[in-house]
């Protein structure tokens, strides 16, 4: 199931989202913003977990930063915001995906790997570019900056596959989820969810106090920074030697938190 999502439905969802969207060049600034928010959270997590054992550090690094925007936030945005804000979500997600679609996995292998890495730059680059979702986002950003549009036939072809991505990503998450959680493992989940909530509070303050955007964009970005952990994080956790089942359980809790936050935002800010 994970291979289907990683190599087929998620890349098609990315291609369709960008191919079907119209946006102004100024909105491309959302790409570095999405990356900065995700990478900033990763750096903080790195700084506060130096004494954690290797598997636990991989668990925190891969699940504390970044957001599930394509499978979770985008449907909410399409329901309560204008089509332009849906495009903004896709652009923000492009920056977010630099970490979620391979960046965090590559860096975590370097930081919490089981053996010494002889060529760290080559190691990170290999992990990054071996991630098909990352390659797809990178290609789309380059084409967008160059003003090249995807062929309408390709957009139409990817639409039914893209529509299946949300269901398959959530189904994959359900297959990985572990409901047998001891007190010690539950404490790790509580720390992770608390850390993500703290990041969301800080990022919300940055959005409302520091960014020169209108209130509609602020409301959108608030929804995005309260979105749940990436649907890919449990798989990357397992691939990095961490507890993939526990990551799946924690992911489900962040989805519940995200639904509550999105509902409150829709009722109060939109």
Stretch-by-stretch model annotation:
Residues 2-270:
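Alpha-helical transmembrane segments of multi-pass small-molecule/ion transporters
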